[in-house]
């Protein structure tokens, strides 16, 4: 199988080729078509298997195809991650793919000055990669709008649960429009948390 067979646009195929990749990994080959179909997805893959590209590529492409860019951009994709290090890594990949399709992304996490994050959000962002706590901080301050989020990704969800982020994640979902994707993700988390308690 090649990346050409995954219905990716020329801009993203070029980005992939620039990175030196020629063949999709198993997680990419399985996940990308499912995401393109608009289905919810629960997937697991080890670090280094191309997991981020598996969700980033189809999301970036679909964001560029639907809802033409508005003058003032509001986030339409949200990726929650457990740590600032992972936020930086995922955000970098989102930027690499998104810039080829004129999409803007940013990372949001604690331990740094919030003012610079507020300024970036104010300029308009399509994709936000965030840790749950700092995202909630922005939501409660009113410095981020989550009403138009179409895609929610919980990256390393098990680790977020292990770190005790379940309540924060559920609060984040309260700020989102309750689409099928969000509701399904929330139910899965609630069930997982119940299993951990039992």
Language-model-detected regions and their locations in the chain:
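Nucleotide phosphate-binding site architecture
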Residues: 22, 42, 60, 87, ...
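Conserved pre-motif I regulatory segment
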Residues: 1-44, 54, 155
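Pre-Walker A (Motif I) flank of P-loop NTPase domains
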Residues: 37-43, 75-77, 125-126, 192-195
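Walker A/P-loop NTP-binding motif
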Residues: 29-41, 52-71, 88, 92-97, ...
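The conserved Walker
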Residues: 45-49
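Conserved nucleic-acid-binding Ia/Ib motif block in the N-terminal RecA-like helicase ATPase lobe
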Residues: 5, 10-21, 68-140, 148-151
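Post-DEXD/H (motif II) to motif III coupling segment of the RecA-like Helicase ATP-binding lobe
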Residues: 145-154, 158-198
């Amino acid at each position: 199988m090649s990346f050409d067979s995954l219905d990716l646009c020329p801009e993203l195929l070029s980005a992939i080729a620039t990175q030196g990749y020629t063949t999709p990994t198993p997680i990419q080959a399985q996940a990308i078509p499912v995401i393109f179909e608009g289905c919810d997805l629960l997937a697991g893959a080890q670090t280094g298997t191309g997991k981020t590209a598996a969700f980033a590529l189809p999301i970036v492409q679909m964001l560029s195809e639907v809802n033409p860019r508005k003058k003032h951009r509001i986030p339409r994709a949200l990726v929650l991650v457990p740590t600032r290090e992972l936020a930086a890594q995922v955000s970098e990949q989102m930027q690499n793919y998104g810039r080829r399709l004129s999409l803007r992304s940013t990372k949001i996490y604690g331990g740094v000055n919030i003012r610079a994050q507020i300024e970036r959000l104010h300029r308009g962002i399509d994709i936000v990669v965030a840790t749950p706590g700092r995202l909630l901080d922005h939501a409660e301050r009113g410095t981020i709008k989550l009403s138009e989020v179409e895609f929610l990704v919980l990256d390393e969800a098990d680790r977020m649960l292990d770190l005790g982020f379940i309540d924060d994640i559920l609060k984040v979902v309260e700020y989102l429009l309750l689409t099928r994707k969000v509701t399904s993700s929330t139910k899965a988390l609630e069930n997982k948390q119940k299993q951990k308690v039992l």
